[in-house]
Amino acid sequence: HLVQNKDQPIRLIDIREKEELVTGYIEGAVFAPNSIVKIRPEEFLPEKDTPLVLYCTSGRRSLATAKMLKGMGYIDVVSMAGGFNAWIEAGYRFKTDGTMDQEQIKRYSRQILMHEIKEEGQQKLLKARVLIVGAGGLGCPTGLYLASAGVGTIGIVDFDRVGLSNIHRQVLHATADIGRPKTDSAKNAILRINPEVNIVTFEQRFTPDNALDIIKDFDVVIEGSDNFETKFLLNDAAFLSGKPYIFGGAVRFDGQASVFYPKGGGPCLRC
């Protein structure tokens, strides 16, 4: 926990709270949560003449705490500019205690810090298998955000090809994709965003003959089609399979979104 400089040892202090350490930490740093340091600094920092470098996530909290400690008689205390985020961006080494690798920690660090997600939630996302029926105006942004969030496997069902009139709203497709199957275009775009995602494509119509077989390996099904026949068909397949069904619809400036999960005690789309 001592960093050497040409004059004397420097003590590196990580003032983040415990739940923030899931994103990693600098090896050798002393963990001293800011919530305690502000009240009882001597518990972690008994010697006021030892040079201290404090860091938090962005550098803002550590800067304020450094000023506070100086006012309490600590002689040489500074804040690491940019905090742990800057350390990571600079490519310096850090350690993690979880099961995610450093690349995953960097990619998902902003959402892992959220209390509603944390590392446990991110692990669930990485293992999740989500099917999207329709790679159009609804399915494209859905696929984009699911991939960015780290959903491990995304299935895409669509039999159509990219047309010029699609591009203004179907954000996974580009002018160069005109004439290509939407499943191929969507897959390539998603992999550019997050190459870790496993993409399973079904270049076919979603019909009563294949519906149950297509959705069988997925945890959640998302409806992004443009017709009621497919919406009700996916609802029925999800009902029979006991899977959550996420419904979506949009016309002009109006939109609807709902989650149907009869197995969990709720209604289905036909109720």
Language-model segments: residues:
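Short beta-strand "acidic-cap" motif of Rossmann-like dinucleotide-binding folds
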Residues: 12-14, 79, 153-158
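Adenine nucleotide-associated cytosolic modules
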Residues: 34, 39, 48, 71, ...
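Short glycine-/small-residue-rich Rossmann-like dinucleotide-binding loops
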Residues: 16-17, 226
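Short beta-strand/turn micro-motifs composed of small residues
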Residues: 14-16, 56, 134, 158
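Rhodanese-like catalytic fold shared by cysteine-dependent sulfurtransferases
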Residues: 1-11, 18-53, 57-123
